[in-house]
From Swiss-Prot:
Main location: membrane
Gene Ontology cellular component list: plasma membrane
Protein name, UniProt field: Inner membrane protein YiaV
One Pfam family here: HlyD_D23
Annotated localization: Cell inner membrane
Sequence intervals crossing the membrane: 27-47, 57-77
GO terms (BP aspect): transmembrane transport
Ranges in the topological domain labelled Cytoplasmic: 48-56
Record key words, sorted: Cell inner membrane, Cell membrane, Membrane, Signal, Transmembrane, Transmembrane helix
Membrane-side (Periplasmic) residue stretches: 17-26, 78-378
Similarity section: Belongs to the membrane fusion protein (MFP) (TC 8.A.1) family.
Topological relation to the membrane, as annotated: Multi-pass membrane protein
Signal peptide boundaries: 1-15
């Protein structure tokens, strides 16, 4: 573009010399040359500042590391690699034997606990009857003892001391039997009354364990979290998959709006605003330009991010970490769907300032796109 401007200026200057018959000497030639330098430099500087450009851009995509929630041996793996998978389709299965066994055992334990609860109810009824019988016997012995006690207070005692003592001991023994029976009845009642949300505590605990066991059993089938695709499926039946977040067994790429993430110079920040028009060219699609909008600007610069490490931090001066990150959303285009995620691109953003200069940036961007045809492998 700068060469085109220079050639245009040279043609314009030559025409001016011819039309106005300006003499060619040591003053007019340097003046025309300096004028061209100032004009071309001014236009390029205006274009660079008001219509930012960067070659550090990429078709970004968010991936989901697939980590099983349970541990086990892989018995089945999907054969849909790099093809669209619907949400809920099976990615792979783990051996469910031990998880199914735990579910079956807990279901049996719940049946046993429910039977035990019913047995406790019957035992409570039996114990209540025993308590009533013990009370009746106690009342009988109490009356007999009172009769012996009243006889002992008469002038002529018809009972011996041994008979009175035996009646007293029978009454006290039966009173203890009543208390023991009542205590056992109360203990059984307390077991029946230990409720959690209206359900017996032991049964509620077993049902909670059963719900967890069923969840773990369901997790032996790993499904697609959304529409998308998997690539580089490296697991095979027989692989031991562990529930470790730092060791995913598969990477899932969800179906999402395709965005371009670009890194601009900090000098361009004042000319980057959400909603500005943008154009993108890809190395993989020479000669084609795609339009879009500047969607967002990251509120943080990567080079300024720090984490606590227990040591004093220094300034991060690593190359490439000082740029402003911006997101560009592209308009719908059939060619974009065929592009693999992660490919590189070049981006130009057109601000409202000095909009007439943006034509220079557009021409340069298209020239860059055509240059992508030229490469040499050797």
């Amino acid at each position: 573009m700068d060469l085109l401007i220079i050639l245009t200026y040279v043609a314009f200057a030559w025409a001016m010399f011819k039309i106005f018959k300006i003499p060619v000497n040591k003053w007019t030639i340097p003046t025309a040359a300096l004028g061209g330098i100032f004009i071309v430099s001014g236009l390029i500087l205006l274009m660079n500042y008001n219509h930012p450009y960067t070659f550090k851009a990429q078709k970004a995509v968010i991936s989901i590391p697939v980590v099983p929630q349970v541990t086990g041996v892989v018995i089945e793996v999907t054969d849909k690699k790099n093809t669209l998978i619907k949400k809920g389709e099976v990615l792979f299965r783990l051996d469910p034997t031990r998880y199914q066994a735990r579910v079956d055992r807990l279901m049996a334990d719940i049946v046993t606990a429910e039977h035990k609860q019913r047995a406790l109810g019957a035992e409570l009824d039996e114990m209540a009857a025993n308590t009533q019988q013990a009370k009746a016997t106690r009342d009988k012995f109490a009356k007999e003892y009172q009769r012996y006690a009243r006889g002992s207070q008469a002038k002529v005692n018809p009972f011996s001391e041994r008979d009175i003592d035996v009646a007293r001991q029978n009454y006290l023994a039966q009173e203890a039997s009543v208390k023991s029976s009542a205590a056992e009845q109360k203990q059984i009642q307390s077991q029946l009354d230990s409720l959690v949300l209206g359900e017996h505590s032991q049964i509620a605990s077993l049902k909670a364990q059963l719900a967890e066991a069923k969840y773990n059993l369901e997790q032996t089938i790993v499904r697609a979290p959304s529409d998308g695709y998997v690539t580089q499926v490296l697991i095979r039946p027989g692989t031991y998959a562990a529930s470790l977040p730092l060791r995913p067994v598969m990477v899932f790429i969800p179906d999402q709006k395709r965005q371009i993430v670009a890194q601009f110079r900090q000098n361009s920040l004042l000319r980057l605003a959400p909603g500005d028009d943008a154009e993108v060219v890809f190395n993989a699609l020479p000669g084609k330009v795609f339009s879009g909008k500047l969607a967002a600007i990251s509120p943080a610069v990567p080079g300024g991010a720090y984490q606590s490490t227990g040591t004093l931090q220094t300034l991060n001066t690593a190359p490439g970490s000082d740029g402003v990150i911006a997101t560009i959303e592209l308009d719908e285009h059939t060619d974009l769907s065929a592009l693999p995620d992660g490919i590189y691109a070049q981006v130009a953003v057109y601000s409202d300032h000095f909009s007439h200069v943006s034509v220079m940036r557009k021409v340069l961007l298209r020239m860059t796109s055509w240059v992508h045809y030229l490469y040499l492998d050797h």
